[in-house]
UniProtKB/Swiss-Prot annotation:
InterPro entries attached to this UniProt entry: Ribosom_uL1_bac-type, Ribosomal_uL1, Ribosomal_uL1-like, Ribosomal_uL1/biogenesis, Ribosomal_uL1_3-a/b-sand, Ribosomal_uL1_CS
Organism of provenance: Ehrlichia chaffeensis (strain ATCC CRL-10679 / Arkansas)
Coiled coil: none
UniProt name for this protein: Large ribosomal subunit protein uL1
Encoding gene (name): rplA
UniProt subunit comment: Part of the 50S ribosomal subunit.
Length: 220
């Protein structure tokens, strides 16, 4: 976690302004939210993961690769997937002949076994298709459209913190706030059933190189 701008707790809009003001890097810094959850990530039933479509997008193109066969290949191409292929593409990935410079990988249920052969390559990059993220589906066109409209995935880390991008410093405060609220709402919907009391411990907003700010309690 980046150091705090101050020990003050801000309302979300003021916090966003402070983060943007403190971003001094010579590139367009991203703006992220970090949500410290009152969970035990070592327990499988308290792990938090999900997807959310950012209403104002990420401010950049989201790239998608699709592993499939037969007619699903053409479906993926028509839906404007960036990389499309079957077993041949899998072999290229194994041999490092294809650099998967993408944000998401999708496949169909009948092709999942083939994709599993490159799980050790996709997994560490966070690209392994997963039914929980709706990235193992026969409805490829629908999934690709959803992703490219601004869908992101989130997952609690081993310390119980969820990190998610909500845009960059060139976004308007209003657009960042709308994306922020979408992420907060999605994480709340993923609250484990075993958590009966406090769910959000702390919420911070951070830019890539700038300092972070703590924002007001958002448990309600």
């Amino acid at each position: 976690m980046n150091s705090l701008i101050s020990n003050e707790v801000y309302d979300v809009e003021s916090g966003l302004r402070k983060v943007i003001e403190s971003a001094k890097a010579n590139f367009c810094e991203s703006v992220d939210v970090a949500i410290n959850l009152n969970i035990n990530s070592s327990k499988s039933d308290e792990q938090v993961r999900g997807c959310v479509v950012l209403p104002k997008g990420l401010g950049r193109e989201i790239k998608v690769a699709v592993f499939a066969k037969g007619g699903y290949l053409e479906m993926a191409r028509e839906a404007m997937a960036d990389i499309v292929g079957d077993e041949e593409l899998i072999e290229e990935v194994k041999k490092k002949q294809c650099k998967l410079d993408v944000d998401w990988c999708l496949t169909t249920p009948d092709f999942m076994a083939s994709v599993s052969s490159i799980a050790k390559i996709l997994g560490p990059k966070g690209l392994m298709p997963n039914p929980k993220f709706n990235t193992v589906t026969f409805e490829l066109a629908k999934a690709i459209k959803m992703i490219k409209s601004g869908q992101i995935k989130f997952k609690s880390d081993k310390t119980g913190i969820v990190h998610a991008k909500i845009g960059n410093i060139k976004f308007s405060i209003e657009d960042l706030l709308e994306n922020f609220n979408a992420v907060i709402s999605a994480v709340k919907q993923c609250k484990p059933a075993s958590i009966k009391g406090l769910y959000f411990k702390d919420v911070f907003i951070i830019s890539t190189m700038g300092k972070s700010v703590k924002v007001e309690n958002l448990n309600n």
